[in-house]
Amino acid sequence: MEEERRDDYKFLRIQDAFKALHLHVNLIGVIVELGFSNGSDCSCTLKIVDPWYSGSGLPVKFVARTIRDLPRVESIGDIILLSRVKIVLINRKITALCNETTSSSFALFNGKHSVDSIPYQSSPKFLMREQDKNFLSNLREWMITYKFEDGSCCFTSLKDIKEGECSNLSCQIVHISKVYKDRWYLFVWDGTEMPPCNILVKSERLPLCVEPEMLPTYMLRKFPTFGSVLRIIVDRVSEKQAIHCLQPGQHVKLLNLFFQVNMGLWNATFTPSTKMQYTMSREMEAFSPQRMCGEKFSPRWNPIARCISRSHSEITGVAHDDAPFVSLMDILTYHNVTAKFRCVVRFIQVYPRDVRKLRDINGNIKLVAILEDATARIHASLYADEGEKFFGCDESDEEALVKKLNRLLGGEEMEKVPRNPPWVQCCLFSFYKHKMDQWESRRFRIFDTWINAS
């Protein structure tokens, strides 16, 4: 009798679940959207679809005694089996409620690239049946040709983001870094350049990156060398538990990210409504740098010229007009310690700012600049004869020096007055200070560059 009752057990199609308000049902579906757990009440949400309902998905809310008991989805596109979940209305939306404190249970299985019928996570009350394996197999086969379409979501490129607003982002995970025990950073990229920021800081030295320290060269070599890499700050417990399913190289859709600017650098944070959404394999393939920008080679300078198309002002001139433009990320990740480069950058800050302090005790110009493009920031020095060439005016003519610096920096450094430094061309060479530790002591210096007369 027990066997007969179990054989009659069936999953409800998701399209029929929308008509089963207040009933307890059994469901199986593909996870197409993942929300973050609410640390205060131990709950989280996701959306599922099946072959008979592939719209935006059925919301499923999980409630547990502890965060540890909530589903820990390894990848968007995995399969979930739900037993005795109740169809309810939450915020006027039909939702399947899986409450651990009642008779509900769930099990998580790997998605279309697996043949395993053993769940990688299941709740204590879950009981696997032999016929469930057929449902798993059929869903995985269906996913091979499945195309998820959620017409309610519009995605914004990084080039179009706005400070203080929330947007949806379709991007590639470049790197995931744990900086402190309480903070992680997601590094994401979509092949476009984030808008340059106005500079508001007057006296405080600007950082080179959002994270506390720049990543080492061997890690940066895994980054794309064109387009901007956005840092997403992750510091809430619930957020950190959700991002464990992300891996470098994955293409992911993030809904409702909050974008902000600090010290002239873009970053983003999760909001209570941030979710991760399913991405098709063909969409992931489109995020290949080689497909987006072909490599060009220069026999004379560095064989790394990319599709650098940033136009520059005529404020500066260089002695090497035939050299290809490269990005600052190209420079940071170049395979030789010493080399020469030509780039288009913004001078966002210089030290010392007071022209009366530009010279050292020997009378040589000595200046450190923070240079920026869409890919990175670096420190670059200007020294001695190259400094004389750069400014091209008498050392006693302080007014001319101030005027040239202001043109380069996009205005005077005044409290609460934003500057918008212009894009200028610049030649750099890299060198090392310590022969026994060349990469760690690698530095950059400006050369064969000058500020044109206004």
UniProtKB/Swiss-Prot annotation:
Listed InterPro entries: NA-bd_OB-fold, POT1, Telomer_end-bd_POT1/Cdc13
Xref: Gene3D superfamilies: Nucleic acid-binding proteins
Tissue expression pattern: Expressed at low levels in roots, rosette leaves, cauline leaves, stems and flowers.
Recorded superkingdom: Eukaryota
Hydrolase found in the keyword field: no
Keywords: Chromosome, DNA-binding, Nucleus, RNA-binding, Telomere
One Pfam entry name: OB_POT1A
GO MF term set: RNA binding; single-stranded telomeric DNA binding
Major place of residence: nucleus
GO cellular component: chromosome, telomeric region; nucleus
Protein location: Nucleus; Chromosome, Telomere
Gene Ontology annotations of biological process type: telomere capping; telomere maintenance
Family assignment from sequence similarity: Belongs to the telombin family.
Its biological purpose: Negatively regulates telomerase activity and participates in chromosome end protection. Binds RNA non-specifically. Associates with a regulatory Pol III-dependent lncRNA, which represses telomerase activity in response to DNA damage. Binds single-stranded telomeric DNA with weak affinity.
Assembly: Interacts with TRB1, TRB2 and TRB3.
Name assigned to this protein: Protection of telomeres protein 1b
Organism listed in the record: Arabidopsis thaliana
Lineage of source species: Eukaryota, Viridiplantae, Streptophyta, Embryophyta, Tracheophyta
